[in-house]
Amino acid sequence: MDGQRQQTYIPAPPPPSATQPSQSHMLSLPPPPPRHLPTQPQGVMPPPPPGPPPGPPPGPGYGASKLANSQLQQQNNLGWQHNWARQALSQGFLPPPPPPPMVPTNQAYGRQTSFSVPNADGPITSATYVPGSNTFGAGVGIPGFDAHTRPSYEAYGTMSGSDRIRGPVHHLYESSGGDGSAYKRDGTVPPTPSARTMPSSLALHDNAQESVASSLPGATAQNHQSQTGQTNEPTKSPSHRQNNSNTLLGGMSPSEAAVQWPLDRVLLWLAKNGFSRDWQETFKTLQIEGADFLDIGHGANGRGNFNKMHNEVFPQLAKECEASGTGWDKERELGEGKRMRRLIRQIHDDDSFDVGIPAQKRRESQAPSEGAPDTSPKLSHEPQSAGPHSGTIENSPNLRAPQLAQPHRHSVQMRSVTLPIPTTHDIASSDFSQTDGISSRSDFSRSVLVGLGVDHRRQSPSMSSDNGNLVAPFRSYEDSPKSGSPATQHATLNQGLSSSSTGDLSVKYEHSRGNSSDSTMGRRYYESRKGQETIRPSPQEMCSRQWTGETSSSYPKEHKGIFNFLKKRSKGGDSTHPSPEEPNLESPTSPVNLRQNGPHLPYTKPSFNASDMSLGERPSSASMSDHERLRGKPAQKGKKWSFVTLDGWNYRLVDITDMDSVETLRAAICHNLGIADWASAQIFLTEPGQSDHEEPLNDTMLALCRRTKSDSIGSLKLFVRGTHLQPVPNHVPNFAGLGVPLPDKHTASPTHHLPRKPLDDEALSRIPPQPQTGPASPQLGIRPQQPKTPAAKFPARDAPQHTEGMSPVEGDQQVGISPEPDKADLLARHEEHKREVERKQKAYLSSKGPPQPRNDSYGETGYRRAGVIDFDERRVSPYEDKKADTLVPLRKPPSAPQESYTLTRINSLRKKDGDRPRAQPAVQTHGLGAVLASMGRMTSAIGTPAPSVPTPTSAGGKQTNFGSFGSPTQGNTKSAPQSSPEKESLDNPGNPAEHRHTKSTAPEIPKPTLQSRKSYGPEFDFEETEVSFQRSPRPQDDSDEDSDDGLFAIPLSNNKASTKENDSGSGTSEAQKRTEKPALTVNTESRLRKGLSVSFRSPSATRESFADANGDSGGREGASFLMAASPEDERPTPRRDSFARGDIWASRPPVEGVIDNLDDFFPDIDLDAPYLDGQGVSPPSSPANRAPPENDLHKKENQPSSSYTGEMNANAGDTLGSNEPTLKPQGGDVVARRNINRSGGGLTRGKSIREVAKGANQASRSRSIHTGNQKSGEILRRKSTKMFGAKIMQIKPKPGSRLSQLDPIPQNNTPSGVPQRQPTFRIIRGQLIGKGTYGRVYLGINADNGEVLAVKQVEINPRLAGQDTDRVKEMVAAMDQEIDTMQHLEHPNIVQYLGCERGEFSISIYLEYISGGSIGSCLRKHGKFEESVVKSLTRQTLSGLAYLHDQGILHRDLKADNILLDLDGTCKISDFGISKKTDDIYGNDSSNSMQGSVFWMAPEVIQSQGQGYSAKVDIWSLGCVVLEMFAGRRPWSKEEAIGAIFKLGSLSQAPPIPDDVSMTISPAALAFMYDCFTVPYRDSSERPTAQTLLTRHPFCEEDPNYNFLDTELYAKIRHVL
């Protein structure tokens, strides 16, 4: 039979193929078993079940079977008979019996031994296996149909004798395949793979087989033909050199390598793996391809061809680099060479010749060069599934010997035929196949499969034909007429399987199977394939792998290829991790699944020859269970997962197990998220809920995080910020190999996922409202909204998230909706909620279809990073707070101290009357006024002129005057416009004001309210007093300064009747003016009076002012303001809790800011309590108090901007006499008594702390105003009073109590005019404003002269003092040293030490107060400084440093935090806690120890082992400060302390200057830093001195055009308060 078959069918006529089309439909008919049963004497193989045989193509498989044992031959023959029978039946030809001579031939070669009879475990392992109902087509074990018409197919005639016997069949197939219909029709008959369709290795094996079977007459000719044809193909590549030893390169023969790796593909591989154009040109020039290319990484010795690299590649590369202008960098290129060798080794190890080449690349390389359907991208490589290989020999696991000849095939080693092929290379493979394949292969294959990475992307040697493509599979799919055909479906699956998400498609251009059950289960195709597809890898494939030296271990490595990241990348949407929304997912049993993975699997591993590939595992259900087995294995292998997110809301799981390179990892992460430009994407570490991310991970940190933080539970979470998302290729239709478009998979975006229902009303209500008419584009819609709502703070890309949860359309519509005005407040209050919503929306939007280019988004992101938006919303400018405070009383005005207790009580009862309509109080005012007036006269010895009553009553306006004088005006001032009324009242205290008031009689009507206050009695006088607004006469008229008024600490109604009359007249006008801006007016009045030294006003006046403060604000405006509220009510919300507030910490306000906010900085002190006038120690206060009221008014008028401040100052300065008295009513008597007691029984003039402070500040301010320079620095820079040698009393109130309720402020006993030998200063300590080396710094004020100062205090806990005496001694010694060192220093750039006070458990140092804070705090808050500022600050610091060194003082702790920056640009060196005085300032002192801050230390400080160091360590520290100012961060910013110590001490390295600094600053600045960083080798003599740098260095030259007020830094820090 066999002989007949050979004779009859060797020249298989093509015509029968024409019949095959019809036969293709008959494939389902089972072949007649009886005919062949007899031919199978051994019956080793069970008779194939009826039905179309999906078994492997007869070609190689048959050849292998013939080479195999007689049993195998018989089995093969049986298979042949089945296949032939079917074909014969369909074609009308009887299947020829297998040729018996083949067995002896095979036996002669000993191949039979290498191929064992299939085990019972693998019942259907032979190539003749008849597929069952659930197994059919190329994907289920039957090789894809081969392109018989191809000339290479004829070369297939070179197959072994058995193949030649089947030759007729081949011919038959070829003829039928000519039109492709044969394949379609004869789907049951596995196409005989031609040399092309089958891997070169297979073809070679065939040759070898034929050579072996050359004894057969007809075979030899064919054999020679096939060999010749095959040899020619591989020789295409000029670099296709065969190893003489015929060893395989990476599992490929040299010919195969030439086909697999043509030059184009090598160049593409280089490009994809990031090799420069120079490398590509080098390879192109040297024509490195095929075996030469693979030799580079995996030469004969397994280590790569180093000679070639160094003798040819690198020299040529150097030329290319020079030619291209890149420049030759040997280290870089050597590193690239190493990387290349490693990547090429991966190609060998992974059995994937495409390693490192994206699937797309592979697609190109795999595209059928022989006319295979290029149009089917998926088919390009995937169709190769069962393809010719499986069909040939792979399907019959027992027939592997032929592959051994593979490596020799191209070398045309006929000797391969003569030599026992199995022994050459197949020994390993045959052993493997027999042992592992049959017995242990299932375990082995499983373990191997688990590790497989991207086999489907790589074509194993067996997978690919000599051309690099499995032509047969393509043709089979292509030719298959219907998508329903197995081949078609397989192809379709490939397309559909491309990846679960379109994003995947964009990432991998290969046809990954997404719908397979494997993908559903997350298994790899090869893994699932093992169970699903029974096609066993041909022995050839196994041989090729074995020849590459691959073992099972190599398989697991496969997934480590660079490609792997592509596969992993698709995890989010990959077939291995399909999203639940994927519509194409099919049940595990779906034939689609079976075919999906099939194409690659058989070729993925030789292990598939094992019995575990038996049919029993083919059912998808089996694959399902198999998957579950396999699924656990990756975890066992240490799978590493990472969660990645674009918005912090939606996370995708990415498998980063095999991402060995950072580029691969980045690309995988970005492709998973749909970011096309992964190179520019930023990756941050994140945690759920984290919204702010500081610095993106660089490559090193990313690799470290992957290595240390990633694990099997996804502990590593990454936030990715890309320029824009990669558009999902939804528009690119998926095509099966047959060109049938497949439904596109849903992208990861919500639009393509399962449809989502629109948000319900409740959900929508939670979203910031937006107009329904918003534009459809979410981003565009949001833009208009931004200016209106807080949403504007967020980048547009975030904003779109408002539509979270909506359908894309709805989301678009609603995104643009602007919030309704009525909800603006709600949005502001719920910003956090809004952020969350926006975050969700961003995620939603980002996933919605191809995202629109977010040009604005990026900019907004940058803007957001700048912190402008969020910062502004969260923090209200303290400066604004100050303004608000200005408008309202800054403190609760205490009761007027002047009033008697009775009056106080009466006024307290009547206090609310002022709130009543002015008209009513006016009437009552007279009645009560008389009573109260008499009472006031009696108690306070104050006579209120009768005119006072008439004054208010006479004219409403005049009453208004009266009232205006009172607090009503003051209250009005607060509420009324500041500048104009104030100016008017101040400017026109006289008639003009009166005219106004007369005009505004209505406002005067409220003034009866003032009268109502007058009804209290004393208010009458008070009002009149106020009426005496006139600056000159009245204040001076206060001849009563020493009157009883002082006794009661109540401002005397020093205004005489005339004064009152004047007040009534001018006061009226003033009241009107004050009505316009009463607060200022009132303050001015009080200020005037105080200026006249009449510090006390009649209680009524005080009361009025108090009432005004409470509610008379309406008095000025008339009935419009009925201020019934108490002073507390009118008082604004507290401006600030304290200096310690986080956002204001270390930002010290200017002195005037402190004065204006004394209550905030000295919260527990009654700043308005009067105390005896100090000794002559407080010159600033007395002149201020004595200053004529005109001065105050003039100041206020000149300073409209600070009018409120002026007003406050006036009021505060007036304290007791101010319109807004602050003492409690009962305080008056007490204070009076105290004054009497303290003064020795005599009456003295009382002053309050507020008065003194404001007086001093006013005088200083007036000076600055007159000079035309309003810089706060000038005010601050006034000379402070030194207190060394004086007696200092520090007053610090107990928490929660006011000084007025505690012991009185210490009074000076000596008369003010008599100087004391030892002056006494009373220092009041306020809020904490900073921390020093050993102590805390508090705000202080000198109660005697009003100077603001800083109190540095070290307090020792008495309980700890006994325990840690050494620490206490150290602290005390440090403070003493600081005091002794600094008390005599005076320099504009050194903080002035004013005095000290030693207590039992504390030491206090009084320092000059510097506003603005330290340079370090400015750097942290505002970033690096511009060079002009750095230059100025450096020059000033050098000046101070030169002065210190001249005085013999080493600072030793110079850093940005210890240099204070005034608001006028002056910097001062501070914190001399560890400074030291020495005689030889620039000589090394061995007693100098290691002190200071590590990052600013000089090397000699750390290295000082008995040698010591000099003051030049301060020069080094100064260089560090300059670097700190330029860089915006400390020196050694990337080092920890220990690292800096090592580099300084051991390596004597200077802190590195960052590139962004060195590239932007001037050469002079660089030179200055380098000079400061001069590293001493023996001593520091080479480092310049401070004086040298100051006078000679170009960087320290003064710039005449420099003005700090014009700098950006000043603009940032000017509003400190």
UniProtKB/Swiss-Prot annotation:
One of its GO terms (biological process) is MAPK cascade. It holds the Pfam family Pkinase. It is an enzyme of class 2 (transferase). Residues 44-60 have a biased composition (Pro residues). Signal peptide: none annotated. InterPro entries: Kinase-like_dom_sf, MAP_kinase_kinase_kinase, Prot_kinase_dom, Protein_kinase_ATP_BS, Ser/Thr_kinase_AS. Residues 1323-1596 form the Protein kinase domain. Residues 1-73, 167-199, 211-253, 345-399, 455-555, 568-633, 739-820, 832-1144, 1165-1277 are annotated as: Disordered. Residues 19-28 have a biased composition (Low complexity). Its EC number is 2.7.11.24. It catalyses: L-seryl-[protein] + ATP = O-phospho-L-seryl-[protein] + ADP + H(+); L-threonyl-[protein] + ATP = O-phospho-L-threonyl-[protein] + ADP + H(+). The keyword Transcription regulation does not apply. Residues 220-248, 482-504, 535-555, 586-596, 897-907, 956-980, 1199-1208, 1257-1272 have a biased composition (Polar residues). One of its GO terms (molecular function) is protein kinase activity. Mitogen-activated protein kinase kinase kinase; part of cell wall integrity (CWI) signaling pathway composed of pkcA, the bck1-mkk2-mpka MAPK cascade and the downstream rlmA transcription regulator. The CWI signaling pathway regulates cell wall integrity and pyomelanin formation. CWI also controls oxidative stress response, gliotoxin production, iron adaptation and asexual development. Finally, CWI is constitutively required for A.fumigatus to cope with the temperature increase found in the mammalian lung environment, during infection. This is Mitogen-activated protein kinase kinae kinase bck1. It comes from Aspergillus fumigatus (strain ATCC MYA-4609 / CBS 101355 / FGSC A1100 / Af293) (Neosartorya fumigata). The gene is bck1.
